[in-house]
Design a protein with these regions (language model features):
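Selected transmembrane alpha-helices and immediately adjacent juxtamembrane segments
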Residues: 2, 142-176
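Hydrophobic transmembrane alpha-helices of multi-pass small-molecule transport proteins
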Residues: 42-47, 102-106, 116-133, 260-279
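Alpha-helical transmembrane segments of compact multi-pass small-molecule transporters, enriched
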Residues: 41-47, 93-107, 181-188, 218-219, ...
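Hydrophobic core positions of alpha-helical segments in small-molecule transporters
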Residues: 11, 37-38, 93-96, 116-119, ...
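Membrane-interface interhelical linkers
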Residues: 1-69, 75-85, 133-147, 180-211, ...
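Juxtamembrane helix-start motifs in multi-pass secondary transporters
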Residues: 32-36, 174-175, 234
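Membrane-interface helix-loop-helix junctions at boundaries between adjacent transmembrane segments
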Residues: 78-116
Length: 279
């Protein structure tokens, strides 16, 4: 019997996987800053509508703001670690962050892991590492390892804190504050970029906008699932989205693929099925 959180988590997994492919195509034409700003604007709009139906909890605002700032810092740390270090080591290392979330959920929240559950988590982590691994990388700059380790800790800790916050106060506080922080950052880094409103009304621009709106809805589903379900299952489950996204990239935009990537995709898909059915 599926837990009540499983459909929400699977919806997030599928939509975020599609978003990865759409993002890849969009960034061929748009700058990262412009895309970041657009995502923030559309997400905040979706979350504002959701907040009307599910009002925020004033008692959870402080924690949500704190986590939103932590998420912004995590983004910078991860980006800087990637810039300085060999991506072939940094990416697989940070892909292990769900393991920390699982450890915290078991140790602090008392969540239990079955054999099937544990096997699914292991497969998800192995798939993430295989998908992230790159055997060749440019010369690393000093200080990348502490940053990569900090990124791992911040990502794993952030997912755990999100579980605690949404369980206590619901998802609305975190949704609105995180999008607001993202919008502020987006307006700053994309201040010289065109708005391109007309471009969003047709063709690929419209497809991108619709996908980002769907991704925002998926985030609502993910945090709603996290508020009622086990973080030790949900976080590793949605962390398999690169596997499905990679498969979609191969099929939809004919990206090149290696045996290592195929193995990672297979492991990720297997992990997603195992984690969902073990719920």
């Amino acid at each position: 019997m599926f837990g009540s959180w499983v459909p929400l988590a699977l919806f997030a997994l599928v939509v975020w996987s599609i978003q990865r492919v759409v993002t890849k195509v969009a960034l061929i034409r748009w700058s990262t800053a412009r895309f970041y700003r657009l995502n923030a604007v559309l997400s905040l709009g979706v979350y504002a509508v959701f907040a009307i139906a599910v009002p925020p909890d004033p008692g959870g605002v402080v924690g949500a703001v704190g986590l939103s700032l932590l998420m912004a810092m995590t983004f910078w740390v991860t980006t800087e670690a990637t810039r300085r270090g060999p991506v072939g080591v940094v990416a697989p290392l940070t892909a292990m962050s769900p393991a920390l979330t699982v450890i915290l959920a078991v140790a602090i929240l008392g969540e239990r892991i079955s054999f099937e559950h544990g096997f699914g988590i292991s497969a998800a982590l192995a798939g993430s590492v295989l998908l992230s691994f790159r055997p060749r990388a440019p010369q690393a700059l000093a200080g990348w390892l502490p940053l990569a380790l900090a990124s791992l800790v911040l990502q794993g800790l952030g997912a755990f804190i999100a579980k605690v916050l949404v369980t206590a106060s619901g998802p609305t506080d975190l949704l609105v504050t995180s999008a607001a922080v993202q919008l502020i950052v987006g307006l700053i880094i994309a201040r010289g970029e065109p708005l391109g409103g007309r471009e969003l009304l047709q063709g690929r621009g419209l497809a991108t906008a619709v996908t980002l709106v769907a991704a925002a809805v998926a985030t609502i589903g993910y945090l709603s699932a996290l508020s009622v379900g086990p973080a030790s299952a949900i976080v590793p489950l949605v962390a398999t989205s690169p596997a499905l996204g990679g498969l979609l990239g191969i099929l939809a935009i004919h990206e090149a693929v290696t045996r290592r990537q195929l193995a990672g995709i297979a492991l990720g898909g297997f992990a997603a099925v195992l984690l969902a059915t073990a719920a």
